[in-house]
UniProtKB/Swiss-Prot annotation:
Annotated compartments: Endoplasmic reticulum membrane
Protein name: Endoplasmic reticulum membrane adapter protein XK
Native source species: Pan troglodytes (Chimpanzee)
Gene of this entry: XK
Subunit structure: Heterodimer with Kell; disulfide-linked. Interacts with VPS13A.
Membrane topology: Multi-pass membrane protein
Length: 444
């Protein structure tokens, strides 16, 4: 049975960030910064409440009549109790004999073109641990993108405007960044396990390292770009946020309405139509919060029973990173044009170049992950390198087609006249089947 390290990491980040935020808010209060104190508490306590609801909802404690657990969740101590419960189950699992064992069937990754199906016995203790890991993974994603991401942006903005980084603020920013990266990592692992549910997925340590570097560069550069733009154009940042928010929030619903599918009723039997709508709106809000800072790795599909699209769409991935790179470049350009005196001692061109290179580095680590370290790369129809080679061939063919014709000189005119004077019988006209199509040119 696997050691519940993911549960321990989630609880540690949750407690550390909440403690650091409460301590920093008291510092703001003593300094008279009421607005910074209110925003710091908001971005700390709101995700705490959402995490409690998530853990309570996943374990279905309302139907199990557990008033003590409900009280602990109301006191914001639910994650600590759940972590204690997880380790009690883990350490007692080897002492008691399992009275009931379920059998799961998973397929191995193909080896030499063959894939075997393996049966595995799952006891009650291991099943409970799997449920706890799943609940804490979802809670980590909620904590990261509905709490840590706004918190990091706020504290970095305060540091830029005050031109000072205190110990408490730097500690909170560090913990918030780790929480966001960890949440994005859990989101990647969840996406892989959902899309390849019938396979036994094993993620190697190097894959975790690659995802960590990919998400670290992507999220850090995105937050810095937003803070720089906000510091010089405070009004226009509201427009940017609203455009991003409504674009990602309405996109799944537009696809759902265009599909003509009936309203989903099988999310939870105990939920009414209003409750189902609230849950779907919350999931869409979480999906929007993730995509505002990084690639979500999962595509919300409301008309699907799993609410998640299991198909990996490379086209959406490419479009997202192209649009995000262009948006970051435009925001940095506007910051460079309207920067104020607080950036007097900052080399603006070098900073812009570093941020753009940092975002490209994130994309590079993403490509490395999908090329070498993805646990299900054997199931891909084509690898990243093969797709890049095909794109390069087509690009070279397009450049050849657009190459301008050379100017015709006197010798060319004279040779054309000589050809016109030759008998028509000597002229050869190409047959229709002798022309190369675009695919042949691309493969040449």
């Amino acid at each position: 049975m696997k050691f519940p390290a993911s549960v321990l990491a989630s609880v540690f980040l949750f407690v550390a960030e909440t403690t650091a935020a409460l301590s920093l808010s008291s510092t703001y209060r003593s300094g008279g910064d009421r607005m910074w104190q209110a925003l710091t508490l908001l971005f700390s306590l709101l995700p705490c409440a959402l995490v409690q609801l998530t853990l309570f909802f996943v374990h279905r404690d309302l139907s199990r009549d557990r008033p003590l657990v409900l009280l602990l969740h109301l006191l914001q101590l639910g994650p600590l109790f759940r972590c204690f419960e997880v380790f009690c189950i883990y350490f007692q699992s080897g002492n008691n004999e399992e009275p009931y064992v379920s059998i799961t069937k998973k397929r191995q990754m193909p080896k030499n073109g063959l894939s075997e199906e393996i049966e595995k016995e799952v006891g009650q203790a291991e099943g409970k641990l799997i449920t706890h890991r799943s609940a804490f993974s979802r809670a980590s994603v909620i904590q990261a993108f509905l709490g840590s991401a706004p918190q990091l942006t706020l504290q970095l903005y305060i540091s830029v405007m005050q031109q000072d980084v205190t110990v408490g603020r730097s500690l909170l920013m560090t913990i918030s960044l780790l929480s966001i990266v960890y949440g994005a990592l859990r989101c990647n692992i969840l996406a892989i396990k959902i899309k390849y549910d019938e396979y036994e997925v094993k993620v190697k340590p190097l894959a975790y390292v690659c995802i960590f570097l990919w998400r670290s560069f992507e999220i850090a550069t995105r937050v810095v770009v937003l803070v720089l733009f906000t510091s010089v154009l405070k009004t226009w940042v509201v427009v940017i946020i609203l455009i991003n928010f409504f674009s990602f929030f309405l996109y799944p619903w537009i696809l759902f309405w265009c599909s003509g599918s009936p309203f989903p009723e099988n999310i939870e039997k105990a939920l009414s139509r209003v409750g189902t709508t609230i849950v779907l709106c919350f999931l869409t809000l979480l999906y929007t919060g993730i995509n505002m800072f990084c690639w979500s790795a999962v595509q919300l599909k409301i008309d699907s029973p799993d609410l998640i699209s299991k198909s990996h769409n490379w086209y959406q991935l490419l479009v997202y990173y192209m649009i995000r790179f262009i948006e970051n470049a435009i925001l940095l350009l506007l910051w460079y044009l309207f920067k104020t005196d607080i950036y007097m001692y900052v080399c603006a061109p070098l900073l812009v170049l570093q941020l753009l290179i940092g975002y490209c580095t994130a994309i590079l680590f993403m490509l490395v992950f999908y090329q070498f370290f993805h646990p299900c790369k054997k199931l891909f129809s084509s690898s990243v390198s093969e797709g890049f080679q095909r794109w390069l061939r087509c690009f070279c063919w397009a450049c050849r087609q657009q190459k301008p014709c050379e100017p015709i000189g006197k010798e060319d005119l004279q040779s054309s006249r000589d050809r016109d004077e030759t008998p028509s019988s000597s002229k050869t006209s190409p047959e229709p089947g002798q022309f190369l199509n675009a695919e042949d040119l691309c493969s040449a």
